[in-house]
Amino acid sequence: MAPSRKNKVAKEEVQVSLGPQVRDGEVVFGVAHIYASFNDTFVHVTDLSGKETISRVTGGMKVKADRDEASPYAAMLAAQDVAEKCKSLGITALHIKLRATGGNRTKTPGPGAQSALRALARSSMKIGRIEDVTPIPSDSTRRKGGRRGRRL
């Protein structure tokens, strides 16, 4: 005999607040970590400590084709989604931490970095500090490509 389905519990949506100390019209900061490689763009918003994730959207979540994941358009859509979620939770301003792949790979941010930053600024979020946090090696492991490098 199949179990009865009468005692289903309705899931309640938890409303996250930033505490009672936030006054109306006060600027509340979050940290937007933008990781822009040449394959994808991540827009990840946390609280100021960086421990609590508020929202994380990637370019691959916004477009269907794999080749478009790192495009400026996908990054713009991802940033708009993140900004909307931040506003609903009461975050009005963002510090930006921009990151490229780094290490022994490229230190140049991908094509989505600029458009993600612009989309955050245009969606009425105040921008605090902008910082480049690309990992730069003090001494690196050997880069791939062999002795004579990548031949085109």
UniProtKB/Swiss-Prot annotation:
Give start-end of the signal peptide: none
A Pfam family found in this protein is Ribosomal_S11
Family per record: Belongs to the universal ribosomal protein uS11 family.
Q: Which HAMAP family match?
A: Ribosomal_uS11 (MF_01310)
Q: Which InterPro entries match?
A: Ribosomal_uS11, Ribosomal_uS11_CS, Ribosomal_uS11_sf
Q: What spans are recorded as compositionally biased (Basic residues)? A: 143-152
Naming one, the record's GO cellular component terms include:
cytosolic small ribosomal subunit
A GO biological process of this protein is:
ribosomal small subunit assembly
Q: Where is this region: Disordered?
A: 131-152
Extract one GO molecular function annotation from the record.
structural constituent of ribosome
Q: Which NCBIfam families match?
A: PRK09607.1 (NF007176)
Q: What keywords would UniProt list here?
A: Ribonucleoprotein, Ribosomal protein
Q: Encoded by which gene?
A: RpS14b
Q: From which domain of life does this come?
A: Eukaryota
SUPFAM superfamilies in the record, alphabetically? Translational machinery components
Name the chain's protein.
Answer: Small ribosomal subunit protein uS11B
